[in-house]
Amino acid sequence: MPTLQKAAASIDDTVEGAMSATLLSLLGVTAKSEKGAAGTNDKVEWLRSQLIGKDVEFDTPFGRRALTYADQTASGRSLSYIEDYLVKQVLPFYGNTHTDDSHVGSKTTRLVHKAASYIKRCMGAGAGDALIFCGAGTTAAIKRLQEIIGVALPSVEMRNRLSAQLRAEERWVVFVGPYEHHSNLLSWRQSLAEVVEVGVDADGLVDVAALRRALGSPEYADRPMLGSFSACSNVTGVMTDTREIARVLHQHGAFACFDFAASGPYVKIDMKSGAADGYDAVFLSPHKFVGGPGTPGILLMNKSLYKLNSQPPSTCGGGTMAYVNGFNEEVSKQIKHHCQDTLYYDDIEEREDAGTPPILQKIRASLAFWVKEYVGYDTMDLHERLFSEMAMKRLLHNPNVMVLGNTNAHHIPIFSFLIYPSVTVKEKPFDAFGEPSCDKQLETMKHKQLSLHGRFVTRLLNDLFGIQARGGCACAGPYGHTLLNVDNELSLCIRSAVLEGYSGLKPGWTRLSFSYYLSKEEFKFILSAIEFIATYGHRFLSLYKFDWITGN
């Protein structure tokens, strides 16, 4: 594979101001280069060769194990390809942006602008869309949108006071789906908005009929409305039909916003702003992309959602204003100059990028997008459909494994499961008359009524096999209640126990991912490990001590 270092030799030869220029033209590579001609398997093999940590080993209670990573839904893996480029080609010329007067300032500013332009192109953004980099992931992106539309509040006390003063037609109504990560649910609940939670239908999918009814309710008429739905469950991998949801929301005058944190690394995201089935805002966590750790969160939004044009930006700081007076607004009133003390930029992307921007993080994010585009959606889909079908077939046929969610729905290969171990029970046989027989005791297999703790299974995957998975509720507690059939009474009992300090009683599961760049050997190894634990995992219980306080 050609290196980015060689390709980057053309950076300084790039024609300034060329309308078609992208970050990739700065790097001297495009999707149609010789990389694009490589075969599907060659691309994935190359990607695996660049994974940082692919040959790492670590010590476990059972000896040294090779690390096998299957926690891509939580965070992706870094790539030598990207990190080497940053170290050798960006950092030597690194300088703060907001200036063209120095070589490093000019070059860094240019790279950052090209990085943003390339990401917008990959996401189908148009002239009416704004890209804002926020914090470290989707959580910050959602919070930024809440600040922009004026519903974010610093405290619950302030929320209660202000909510009572708002007229009904002023208060936002926000519709959320059943799969939501806590970041796309709790922050809305704590905002000024009225939150309407849409549940699942009989198939465990978003109840679109219920959404239609809620949107058409007279109590929400003439009020600003917004839907904020997960594009894919980070627990089950079940995909939401975002186009259908967008159409339904738009038909009722609501904005359509989607959280692509779980599926963003693998699916095409096309804003289609202004279309009936287009998106008005997308939240994204590029750190979940392969090559993405160390990237910022992304909010791509239609400018019609921006409510701060005549006000200061959501965060004030350097690089957001055109001019600041030597006196503040109160002084200007005293001297009869009724004007604001600060002139902020009109451009949304400039005014919402206060202070030193996440320079390396933005460039790294664009490179992670490039890797995604280079591998190609057909390649990713082919590998993931194969992994999903094979994994589902083996796991569903194992009587000790229960895969959560609708296993027939369209989904990406994110699997959350419970293990109900079978145990050998010795029973005395009976004769034809129902009397105890003198024959030798028979051994029968019976299934326990309780599953192994999700975090215990995760520890066994780690300790026995070196497999990195995740135990718990995956920050999707309300959806977990649905999946595990936890009713209100049981939920309150669990809450009471947690209040007493027993966090270990919280229900959960084991989750892992079969990302497209796993090797076939790794894929089969992970499945075999699950099957081993499903058969023998309970025998290791005596070797572990459970902490009811922490859940460790």
State the predicted function of each range.
Residues 2-552:
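Pyridoxal 5′-phosphate
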